[in-house]
Amino acid sequence: MTTRGTKSALRPPTSIETTDAFAADVDAGLTAKPKRLPPKYFYDAAGSALFEQITRLPEYYPTRCELALLHENAAAMASFFPSGCALIEFGSGSSRKARVLLGAAATVEAYVPIDISSDFLQQDAAQLRRDFPHLAVYPVIADFTAAPELPPAVAHMSRVGFFPGSTIGNFEPHEAAGFLRRAGRLLGAGAVLLVGVDLIKAPDSLYRAYNDAAGVTAKFNLNLLARINRELGADFDLAAFEHHAFYNAERRRIEMHLASTKRQKVRVCGVTVEFRAGETIHTENSYKYSIDSFQALAHGSGWSPLAVWSDNMFGVHLLRVTNET
C-alpha cells in the first residue's frame, strides 16, 4: 500500500558537496580547449525562473507545441500507464507538463519529480500537494543525469518515466543513449517512458527560438556567469560577454555560447582564465531529431518504440524498456 500525503525530499547533497562539484566542473570547463560549461548549472533559482519565462515566449515553440500534444493526447498516453504506478519525471522544473498527465491518469498513485534546483523543486512540490491532495509527492533533489536514488515508498510500484521539454537534445547522441540505458535500469523491467523530442525544421524557426526579441534567453545564458560569481567568488564582467546562439546544420543542433567581447582575464576558483576577443564558452547544445532517427536511438539503447504523437514541430515518444541495460 502506498503511503499518501506529504513527504520530505530525499537528502540533497550538502552545500559543501554541491559547491565542490560545481567548482570542479567550472575549473575543468574553463581550462579546456575550447572552453565549455555544463548546461545543468543553468538551473539555480534565478536560472530556473528565467527558463520558465523562456517557455512562455512567443518565439519559443517547443513548450507550446509539447503542451498542445499533451493536452490533445493525454488520455491516450495515460492508457499505457499500469494501475497504481509512480510517475518519475527527470528534470521536472515547474511540473507544468506533468500536471496534464496527472489530470488524465487516475492510475498514477505517486509522483517523483527529480531536479537539481532545490528551492524551485520544494516550492513546486508543495503546490502539487495542494492541487492533488490524494497524490503522494516525493521530490528528489538530485542530478537526474547521474543515478538518482528513488524514494523507498515507490520501490514496489510500477514506474512510468517522463522526460519532456526536448531536454534529451541537450545530450550528445552517445550521452542520450547512456541516459536512456540508465533510465531503463532505474525504471525497471516493463516500464514505459514518455520523451519530448524537438524535430528537425527550418533554421530560421530554430534561430528565433533561441534569440528572442526580449532577450530573456540571453539573460538565461549570462546568468551562468553570474552564478559563478555569486557562488564561487569569480569576477566575470557580464557586460563583457554576449549571448550567441546559432544552428549548426551539419550536426543538426542549436549551439549556445557566451562570447568575450574583448581580450580579458577572469579570476575563477583561484585560477586566472584568459579570453581572446571573440573567444567563446560553449554552454549548451540542443540536438534535433527526425522521428525515425530518435526511434533508432531509443531502440539501440534498450527501448522499444510504442507510439509517437507529433506535429511538424515536435514529437512525444512513448517507449517500453526491452531489457535491463
Name every feature range the model reports, one short phrase each.
Residues 186-200:
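Conserved beta-strand signature within the Rossmann-like core of class I S-adenosyl-L-methionine
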Residues 114-119:
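Conserved SAM/SAH-binding beta-strand->alpha-helix loop
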